[in-house]
């Protein structure tokens, strides 16, 4: 590569990276914890689920009987789904299509149903710390759609930074990978770490940049298609992409008896081996034109993209359509499922989740080291003092905001365990207020050494108290959880003990003289 091209790619890499650095750190840090969303949710609620996802297992007839006691179901479309490995399933009731129905029946409803107690919860009540961290990694807390678009554009620029980063290191990609000079000057140490760990994490980061941009910017990309290909009919496009189903008209002829829906679920599950049910759609409940659609997927070890579906006509007990997950996976199914599987990392058990978590933290380190390289490169005598001070203040703010996430997250685990009725409002207020306070404290310290060391140290100390708080409040000490096969509770406790031990060790390894480059001003 000639020098001119190298300089262009280098500056593009630097500019694109520094612009998105803080937002990108939040995405990777929160996203790393989001791999364990279900485990965190069940640990918080003290409700154990099998480590292996089994889909919907509750008797659907029992669910419908329970719903019918509260809601008039005739003429409604009912969707029952299970998206996460929790005890709760989500239930979506459409407004009744019966024009003679009561005003109450003409209102839709969405809630979560506990499959053990049959208690219902709205979204705010069902909110967990796992859900919060999952949604934080694509900025869902920012009003829709701005948070989604922000995370999508961050992912897009991250993809740009990845490609330019590989290009500028291309000529020495092998030799530089093996170079690490711990006794060299600070910029060299950061550069070696940034290069080596960046190359290790490149495939992981590339996958998440592509899939993240796709998920978050798909609405923008879809807009021209809706206008030109579907004449502005958004519903039609979603139907063809199989995100929604075509509405069925009501015949206004009530069935004398409602047949068992569970038998259709059982029949579908028995049709294919290792098939778990994920969604049940009931159209026109109680009507002559009532249809039941049962969807699910094969065990991911059996087939990576094995989605199956059977649609039944209730009045005749006939199968209207059938999609074999072994032989009839469409191109559309393949694309959607591959992108989802790659992004969520849910196709190979805990080993893949742990590896993905570690790669996510490595990505956080790559981001931090990149910012510090940028600072050291601009801390030169020929650069005006005002610019140098501004650069140091900027990086101090960046690092303070990023690293204060660790103790904030650890403290939030204890908070949701101490306050068992913590809902969405509580988690929002606690997390963001703690994050703000810690960020301000670290910024006021004006010391990169103090921020790095004490963020890790405080986070580690709090992290050690997480399994202790769980043991005191619930009685599920990790050794007891292990002996009673409460795997998710055991996993989260051990997870924090290991993570806190590692970060505590790292905090003790940080030395003040490593930051002597910054001693020329208050931000040293």
What do the PLM-derived regions correspond to, one by one?
Residues 401-414, 424-443, 458-466:
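Generic alpha-helical transmembrane segments
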Residues 38-80, 235-293, 299-304, 315-324, ...:
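Membrane-proximal low-complexity regions enriched in glycine and acidic/polar residues
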Residues 98-138, 163, 300-341, 365-372:
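Extended, hydrophilic extramembrane loops/domains of integral membrane proteins
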């Amino acid at each position: 590569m000639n020098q001119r091209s190298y300089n262009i790619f280098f500056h593009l890499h630097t500019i694109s990276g520094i612009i998105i650095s803080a937002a990108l750190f939040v995405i990777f840090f929160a996203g790393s914890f989001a791999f364990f969303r279900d485990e965190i949710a069940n640990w918080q609620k003290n409700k154990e689920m099998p480590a292996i996802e089994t889909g919907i297992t509750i008797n659907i007839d029992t669910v419908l009987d329970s719903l019918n006691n509260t809601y008039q179901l005739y003429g409604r479309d009912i969707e029952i789904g299970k998206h996460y490995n929790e005890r709760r399933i989500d239930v979506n009731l459409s407004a009744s299509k019966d024009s003679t129905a009561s005003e109450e029946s003409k209102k839709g409803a969405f809630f979560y149903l506990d499959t053990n107690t049959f208690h219902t919860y709205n979204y705010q009540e069902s909110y967990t710390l796992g859900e919060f961290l999952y949604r934080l990694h694509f900025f869902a807390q920012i009003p829709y759609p701005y948070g989604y678009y922000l995370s999508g554009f961050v992912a897009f620029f991250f993809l740009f930074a990845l490609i330019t980063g590989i290009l500028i290191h291309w000529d020495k990609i092998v030799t530089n990978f093996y170079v690490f000079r711990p006794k060299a000057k600070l910029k060299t140490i950061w550069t070696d770490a940034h290069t080596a760990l960046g190359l290790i994490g490149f495939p992981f980061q590339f996958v998440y940049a592509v899939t993240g941009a796709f998920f978050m910017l798909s609405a923008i990309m879809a807009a021209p298609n809706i206008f030109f290909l579907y004449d502005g009919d958004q519903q039609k496009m979603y139907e063809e992409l199989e995100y929604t189903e075509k509405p069925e008209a009501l015949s206004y002829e009530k069935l004398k008896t409602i047949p068992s829906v569970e038998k259709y679920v059982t029949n579908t599950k028995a049709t294919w081996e290792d098939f778990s049910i994920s969604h049940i759609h009931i159209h026109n409940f109680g009507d002559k034109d009532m249809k039941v659609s049962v969807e699910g997927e094969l065990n991911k070890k059996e087939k990576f993209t094995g989605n199956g579906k059977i649609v039944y006509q209730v009045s005749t007990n006939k199968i209207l359509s059938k999609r074999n997950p072994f032989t009839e996976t469409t191109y559309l199914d393949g694309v959607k499922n591959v992108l989802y599987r790659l992004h969520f990392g849910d196709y190979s058990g805990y080993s893949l989740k742990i590896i993905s978590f570690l790669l996510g933290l490595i990505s956080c380190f790559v981001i931090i080291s990149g910012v510090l390289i940028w600072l050291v490169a601009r801390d030169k005598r020929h650069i005006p003092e005002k610019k140098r001070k501004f650069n140091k203040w900027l990086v101090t703010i960046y690092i303070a905001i990023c690293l204060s996430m660790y103790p904030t997250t650890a403290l939030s685990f204890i908070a949701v365990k101490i306050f068992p009725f913590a809902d969405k409002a509580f988690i929002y207020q606690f997390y963001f207020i703690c994050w703000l306070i810690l960020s301000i404290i670290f910024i006021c310290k004006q010391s990169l050494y103090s921020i790095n060391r004490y963020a890790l140290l405080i986070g580690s100390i709090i992290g050690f108290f997480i399994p202790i708080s769980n043991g005191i409040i619930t009685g599920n000490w990790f050794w007891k959880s292990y002996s009673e096969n409460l795997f998710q509770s055991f996993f989260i406790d051990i997870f924090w003990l290991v993570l806190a031990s590692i970060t505590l060790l790292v905090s003790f390894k940080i030395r003040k003289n490593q930051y002597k480059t910054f001693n020329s001003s208050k931000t040293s």
